[in-house]
Amino acid sequence: MKSAEIREAFLGFFEEQGHTRVPSSSLIPGNDPTLLFTNAGMNQFKDCFLGQEKRAYTRAVTSQKCVRAGGKHNDLENVGYTARHHTFFEMLGNFSFGDYFKRDAITYAWTFLTSEKWLNLPKEKLWVTVYATDDEAYDIWTKEIGVPAERMVRIGDNKGAPYASDNFWTMGDTGPCGPCSEIFFDHGADIWGGPPGSPEEDGDRYIEIWNNVFMQFNRTADGVLHPLPAPSVDTGMGLERVSAVLQHVHSNYEIDLFQSLLTASANAIGCSNDNQASLKVVADHIRSCGFLIADGVLPSSEGRGYVLRRIIRRACRHGNKLGAKGSFFYQIVAALVAEMGSAFPELVQQQSHIERVLRGEEEQFAKTLEQGLKIIEQDLAELKGTVVPGEIVFKLYDTYGFPMDLTGDIARERNLTLDEEGFEREMEAQRVRARSASSFGMDYNSLVKVDVATQFTGYSATTGSASVVALYKDGQSVTHLNAGEEGVVILDTTPFYAESGGQIGDSGFLLAGDARFDVSDTTKTGGAFLHHGVVASGSLSVGVQVETQVADEVRDATKLNHSATHLLHAALRQVLGEHVQQKGSLVDSQRLRFDFSHFESIKPEQLRALEDIVNAEIRKNTPVVTEETDIDTAKKKGAMALFGEKYGDSVRVLSMGGEFSVELCGGIHASRTGDISLFKIVSEGGVAAGVRRIEAVTGAAALAWLNSAEDQLKEAATLVKGNRDNLLDKLTAVLERNRLLEKQLEQLQAKAASAAGDDLSSAALDVKGVKVLATRLDGQDGKALLALVDQLKNKLGRAVILLGSVHEDKVVLVAGVTKDLTGQLKAGDLMKQAATAVGGKGGGRPDMAQGGGVDATALDSALALAVPFVEQGI
């Protein structure tokens, strides 16, 4: 049996036993913030087992997509090197919420595994374990099912504590728990390993394929087990494992599902499909990456996004090891969709998105992969001993974007281990995100290297005098820049703010006699401030004195937006909750953009509350206070720090509205909150899983936005011959009149179609005693065609009808079969053929079906399918 057939057989079997087929939940747990990813079938039913949720059914069956990579359940480092470790797997499961219990659960499992109608596994190959004191389950297995005692194993507390056992399941230290019974398959004496509970149980001969968990107790804090009033059942069977059993192979990578992915991986890389660990890594990782992206996860430097990035980069590195040239990983998505898209339609819907995300991440990593591999080869060649120091591991992570487990893979191939504690110390000390090459043209920060510490005077001034200490052109040090040349100027002192903390760098100009350098941006590398721009006139040389001038209007507008960002952050935590954290920001002179963690879209009333809170703080006109202090003192005062930012011994604490907003910030700000004048949110939306974005304007820009909105209201009122006071009433009246006119139009179209039906019936062909009518009626919508098909069926008698129309640039199709023919000819079957022909899809009942497509040029060809459909079916 193929994997897809096994999945469907499992779901079908339990549906026959009265179970409701429940779709797989997302890989992002919706009801359990303690989980990084969904990793078991029972995750979506957790509240049902806890008695906190009641559903319309008490029996459920699922095929749940699961990921184990990152967090407590992390199989990543073993993937590709063992027969059964995966980052992604499918868990088949049946569940009872206070309905049936041990006897039925055991009987169902045995019947499905051994019945000739279902999997038909040889009974003598199956072993069973039960919890040591679970006599009830043992007796059911031996006395009712008939499993001989020699293939039954009692497993006690083998993990060092009461009820700490492979055969006793707990949800936590307290709560629902109970014994479990596992079913093992014996692969045969030619494979090393012993039965469960034996010293050789870790071998590959006896493989667990099904686990039945019997939740019958509630464990209280004192460790006492109390019987649950309504015991439940939670079972799980890995699809990949049972597929290996039924396909008579000993590795999950040999099953049909993986064979197609291995072939596609080899083709994309350009290597042979041999039994190579790296190829298995790629084939495994395309599943977890594809499904995670389909469920809304995007590569990032933290949380779920970072786990995804690690998996992608591990796959890229293994592809590189096999000789991949250029981007290859995204090319395997099509094979994944072909293999699993029918069971998980989200893959089909998201295919192009998945490919774009993978290709983008792959191309970004390719910029540093080759250089990073050279560095690690050099470091390992010079290594003394068998442990890779944490400093090297961190350097690869920080500079080249190598996740620790990717470096671990490389070390493992050389029988080396990593100094993980040393790596964690480096991470804790530095607190910086991985740095990768910029994708936005030349990055002067990475090219300009100068041992200069520029003195910043911009907190209190926008002008001043300074000396040019260095000049750079195309990343190379030069002694002068001439008119028209772009470059970088480094000064000994500057009022120009360097881009940091989301605030853009200052712009302005430098003057030295007849020379003028227009500054378009200011950045920072080390202690040096880099003034990017172009020489507008004259020539600029190292050592000359210049007069500095920041663009005041741009600076003033920018600092208002920056201060408003702090007020917004504080307001968000008030309105949405303390979980809100800044995930990114961009502050310029036009508007502010603020990204933050939040799990759902923001309601209109919440947006209004945010505006009200921020504007209230603005009206209070309190002073914006800055204080230089040490990091520990700042944190004790409640100052919020940005995750991933590096802070020195001395930090700048910015307070607004007393304790309303207290954050660490080195940016330029307003003097008082009243300077902001006005705050207006102009957009809100999601940018990634769990990340929302708000854009807003302040001051004069906010007033301009409101004036524009007022102008649009006036224009709309004029169009409906009203005014601002009665605009809503006027619009409602227009919409109601439009609705009535549309209804009248439908009625007229139906009458026209009915009249056309009289003419059309005479055009029907006689095919083997069946009236066949296939014609196009452009301009008619689906509703009109449905009514016409009903009318034609009554007029024609024994008939098959296929009508098509091009309506609003799309193809509309309706098929009908009179009921006396539905035993031989089904409208849904005809519709599938016709809809496919026009690049779409369709279906329906045996007597009536609807569909459509996008290829209007193929409509006549689609209609021509009706006659052969009848000829072949009668």
Curated annotation (Swiss-Prot):
UniProt keywords, alphabetically: Aminoacyl-tRNA synthetase, ATP-binding, Cytoplasm, Ligase, Metal-binding, Nucleotide-binding, Protein biosynthesis, RNA-binding, tRNA-binding, Zinc
PANTHER family attached to this UniProt entry: ALANINE--TRNA LIGASE, CYTOPLASMIC, ALANYL-TRNA SYNTHETASE
NCBIfam families in the record: alaS
InterPro entries reported for this sequence: aa-tRNA-synth_II/BPL/LPL, Ala-tRNA-lgiase_IIc, Ala-tRNA-ligase_IIc_anticod-bd, Ala-tRNA-synth_IIc_core, Ala-tRNA-synth_IIc_N, Ala-tRNA_ligase, Ala_tRNA_ligase_euk/bac, DHHA1_dom
SUPFAM superfamilies named among the record's database cross-references: Class II aaRS and biotin synthetases, Putative anticodon-binding domain of alanyl-tRNA synthetase (AlaRS), ThrRS/AlaRS common domain, Translation proteins
UniProt keyword ATP-binding present: yes
Residue sites binding Zn(2+) per the record: H562, H566, C665, H669
Function: Catalyzes the attachment of alanine to tRNA(Ala) in a two-step reaction: alanine is first activated by ATP to form Ala-AMP and then transferred to the acceptor end of tRNA(Ala). Also edits incorrectly charged Ser-tRNA(Ala) and Gly-tRNA(Ala) via its editing domain.
Listed name of the protein: Alanine--tRNA ligase
Cofactor note: Binds 1 zinc ion per subunit.
Record remark on domains: Consists of three domains; the N-terminal catalytic domain, the editing domain and the C-terminal C-Ala domain. The editing domain removes incorrectly charged amino acids, while the C-Ala domain, along with tRNA(Ala), serves as a bridge to cooperatively bring together the editing and aminoacylation centers thus stimulating deacylation of misacylated tRNAs.
Domain of life (superkingdom): Bacteria
Entries under Gene3D superfamilies matching the protein: 2.40.30.130, 3.10.310.40, 3.30.54.20, 6.10.250.550, Bira Bifunctional Protein, Domain 2, Threonyl-trna Synthetase, Chain A, domain 2
Name of the gene encoding the protein in the UniProt record: alaS
Gene Ontology cellular component list: cytosol
Main location: cytoplasm
